[in-house]
């Protein structure tokens, strides 16, 4: 329950940064994000473990002005800052996606972005 509370608080915050959830496998990280995603107009879920080909999108320019249209086209879903959630699941499988979080914060802070993964080391 605490996770839902904090994610909801994060969702409503005007001074929001991309969120990175770390934890052991099978503890409910993805579930809590999907449940939070229901509060948005839409959610694009990128699972780097199930769809490794998506890593190619993150192999070049990591700017949101490039990534947002590419992900929208690939998943056939609109990513609208302030209305959409971009969920980068199993993010440890794509180190470039982890790097992209910085650019989402700097260049497109209105887009809600959550990364989740296990075995993340910093």
Where are these regions (language model features)?
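Phosphate-binding site recognition
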Residues: 1-122
């Amino acid at each position: 329950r605490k996770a839902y509370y904090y994610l909801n608080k994060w969702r409503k915050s005007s001074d929001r940064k991309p969120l990175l959830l770390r934890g052991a496998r099978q503890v409910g990280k993805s579930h809590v994000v999907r449940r939070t995603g229901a509060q948005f107009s839409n959610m694009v879920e990128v699972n780097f473990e199930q769809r490794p080909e998506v890593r190619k999108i993150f192999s070049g320019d990591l700017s949101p002005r490039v990534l947002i249209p590419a992900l929208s086209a690939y998943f056939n879903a609109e990513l609208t800052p302030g209305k959409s959630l971009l969920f980068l699941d199993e993010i440890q499988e794509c180190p470039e996606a982890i790097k992209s979080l910085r650019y989402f914060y700097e260049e497109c802070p209105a887009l809600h972005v959550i990364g989740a993964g296990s075995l993340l080391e910093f």
